[in-house]
Amino acid sequence: MEKVLALLLVTLTVAYAVPDPRGIIINLDEGELCLNSAQCKSNCCQHDTILSLSRCALKARENSECSAFTLYGVYYKCPCERGLTCEGDKSLVGSITNTNFGICHDVGRSSD
């Protein structure tokens, strides 16, 4: 009986030691349900309406709608990809009501 328990203990230890590449709570892929942007690989947890489920989504591309900032960690429009800037409303009221939408622009390219 002791050998069986020891074998079971070793098996469980090895099973827990192997990292799972797919996230359950963090490191979530695009399309998976989320509660906050920090859970997503893309750092964007997005929903369409206040009653809809939030899912991880890709960040906004150039010339697409974006949100500059959110207080809640969930966006209606995702923030811009790296290197782009969200040109639009950056007010506190817009952040509270989650209506601070803009358009992603490449500032470096537009100044040339």
From Swiss-Prot:
Disulfide bonds join C34-C45, C40-C56, C44-C78, C66-C86, C80-C104. One of its GO terms (molecular function) is lipase binding. It holds the Pfam family Colipase_C. Transmembrane segments: none annotated. Residues 1-17 form the signal peptide. Forms a 1:1 stoichiometric complex with pancreatic lipase. Colipase is a cofactor of pancreatic lipase. It allows the lipase to anchor itself to the lipid-water interface. Without colipase the enzyme is washed off by bile salts, which have an inhibitory effect on the lipase. Enterostatin has a biological activity as a satiety signal. Belongs to the colipase family. This is Colipase. It comes from Sus scrofa.
